[in-house]
């Protein structure tokens, strides 16, 4: 069996469907499969009738899954998007860090790491983690002669009309326009559509059905132009994309390379243009600053995690909301504690099941003996009734009826397999085992704080690398290849090679001055004492328009009716988004301390 680790369910599905169509016995194991489908898949694995199994990296954190794999001969571990393992990579994913440990535990004899965007530093990191010798590291060239790279320095207020003019030259050719923000994709698509262009927006904020419909329309040629965030493109295999426009600066040269790489896969010439404006740097830097957790929040989480009994479970979602830290940061912290030998992940489980009977309960019970009927009656009596669904908590039910939680979960799965009930599991929790306590908790805390500070600095350096590239006076392709450890004299067909020299600096707009009204607004927000805005960083994020777990909190409208709305509906949300995050953070610190 070859085990393939891939980061996206959509990508796995496309690849497995393609392999099966070619007669190759491949399968995927992911959260979209039903209990019955999962059971059938395991049966096929046990019979060795599957050659390739695709899983997400998180799947290997499941102790039960690893126990099943240990019984199956594994020939190869293939890791797609392997740059995700590197702290220095542009798309670090903490679960990738544990893959080396799992490869050793499962005694997999060979590992294949694949990536299209590894810098020399990231490649060294991958080789170090998987003990890959230098002679086994193979790198193909990043140069593609059919991609014409263009950088156009342009002011924010000129960008939209310039893009319209460019698109009108060939309005029917397949084109992707990348924007940073979801509302940017929406507003730009709306503008271009009003000018008669066949365009649709695409971003993660759309419903999955809408995203699928838009993607299908683009693939078929019905809609040739897509305005999208980076949510669009992974797994898109359309060979005739003729143009890629970066309406905003990309967040790294790795992202830029990945995105322009979607053009011209048929070998024909394609146009890749970056509309470079310094103003974008402020927005991207704000996101980076906003992602960095508060030291006090990290101290609190470490204290909670390392003061647990031997076996415990947590909800990443609950920890995230309680400490106003993004779930990815929580996952990174948990992974770090695992790699340091403090914790060991066991198995995830759902703490709540919504249950709907597909037939009358009495009719269902008639199919069982009296002992099981009694057990099922008691079990369903513990559930909280709703309009269409019962809500059952296995842990609470176990305590009430004196049965094990494992038996209750197994029973729910069994009834679902029989199609006696429909089930919606929710509130995922991850089990952990505490292996040891730190000898010096303050020192460990400081190491964790430093870890996230390094991450912030690394992300900011990548942003600056994009600006440096945009201002290069020499060949753009040579500049890009140098970033990935390749050498090239000049390509002869980029905008620099065609004689278009860059300005000394990218066009930029000055941040507006803060007014007395702005300072008064900040103080009023402090005086509200909202739970989601109690720290300077949370308040600064809110004012700069960044979403975080805290912005999902509710606040009471000041009308005396005790009506609640989410914080992001507040008039002050994103009011200071044109200001640098660091400046707003300093003001918030001064106001809260005062």
Predicted features by range, described:
Residues 295-594:
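Accessory DNA-binding and partner-docking regions appended to nucleic-acid-acting proteins
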């Amino acid at each position: 069996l070859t085990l393939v680790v891939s980061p996206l369910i959509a990508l796995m599905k496309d690849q497995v469907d393609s392999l099966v169509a070619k007669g190759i016995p491949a399968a995927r194991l992911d959260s979209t499969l039903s209990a019955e489908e999962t059971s059938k898949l395991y049966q096929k694995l046990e019979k060795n009738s599957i050659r390739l199994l695709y899983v997400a990296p998180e799947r290997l954190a499941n102790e039960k899954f690893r126990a099943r794999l240990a019984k199956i001969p594994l020939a190869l571990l293939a890791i797609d998007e392997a740059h995700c393992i590197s702290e220095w990579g542009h798309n670090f994913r903490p679960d990738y860090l544990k893959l080396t440990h799992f490869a050793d535990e499962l005694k997999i004899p060979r590992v294949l790491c694949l990536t299209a965007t590894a810098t020399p530093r990231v490649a060294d990191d991958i080789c170090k983690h998987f003990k890959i010798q230098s002679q086994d590291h193979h790198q193909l060239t990043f140069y593609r002669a059919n991609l014409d790279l263009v950088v156009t320095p342009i002011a924010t207020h000129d960008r939209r009309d310039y893009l319209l003019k460019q698109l009108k030259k060939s309005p029917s050719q397949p084109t992707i326009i990348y924007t940073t923000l979801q509302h940017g994709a929406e507003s730009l698509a709306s503008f271009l559509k009003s000018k008669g262009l066949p365009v649709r927006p695409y971003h993660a904020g759309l419903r999955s059905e809408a995203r699928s419909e838009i993607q299908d329309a683009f693939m078929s040629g019905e809609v040739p132009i897509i305005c999208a965030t980076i949510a669009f493109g992974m797994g898109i295999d359309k060979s005739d994309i003729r143009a890629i426009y970066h309406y905003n600066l990309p967040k790294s040269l790795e992202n830029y390379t990945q995105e322009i790489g979607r053009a011209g896969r048929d070998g024909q010439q394609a146009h890749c243009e970056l509309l470079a404006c310094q103003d974008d740097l402020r927005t991207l830097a704000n996101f980076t600053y906003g992602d960095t957790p508060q030291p006090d929040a990290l101290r609190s989480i470490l204290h909670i995690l390392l003061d647990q009994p031997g076996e415990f479970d947590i909800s990443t979602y609950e920890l995230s909301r309680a400490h106003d830290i993004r779930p990815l940061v929580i996952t990174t912290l948990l992974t770090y504690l695992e790699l340091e030998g403090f914790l060991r992940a066991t198995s995830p489980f759902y703490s709540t099941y919504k249950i709907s009977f597909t037939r009358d309960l009495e009719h269902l019970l008639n199919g069982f003996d009296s002992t099981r009927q009694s057990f099922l009656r008691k079990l369903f009596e513990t559930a909280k009734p709703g309009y269409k669904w019962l809500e059952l908590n296995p842990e609470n039910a176990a305590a009430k009826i004196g049965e094990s939680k494992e038996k209750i979960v197994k029973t729910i799965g069994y009834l679902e397999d029989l199609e006696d009930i429909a089930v919606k599991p929710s509130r995922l929790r991850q089990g952990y085992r505490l292996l040891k306590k730190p000898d010096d908790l303050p020192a460990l805390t400081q190491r964790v704080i430093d870890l996230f500070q390094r991450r912030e600095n690394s992300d900011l350096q990548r942003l600056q690398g994009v600006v440096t590239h945009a201002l290069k006076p020499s060949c753009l392709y040579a500049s890009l290849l140098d970033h990935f450890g390749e050498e090239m004299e000049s390509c002869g067909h980029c905008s620099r090679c065609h004689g278009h020299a860059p300005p000394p600096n990218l066009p930029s707009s000055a941040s507006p001055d803060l007014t007395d009204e702005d300072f008064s607004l900040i103080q009023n927000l402090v005086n509200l004492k909202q739970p989601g805005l109690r720290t300077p960083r949370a308040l600064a994020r809110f004012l700069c328009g960044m979403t975080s777990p805290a912005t999902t909190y509710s606040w009471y409208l000041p009308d005396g009716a005790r009506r609640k709305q989410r914080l992001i509906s507040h008039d002050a949300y994103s009011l200071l988004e044109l200001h640098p995050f660091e400046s707003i953070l300093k003001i918030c610190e001064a106001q809260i301390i005062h």
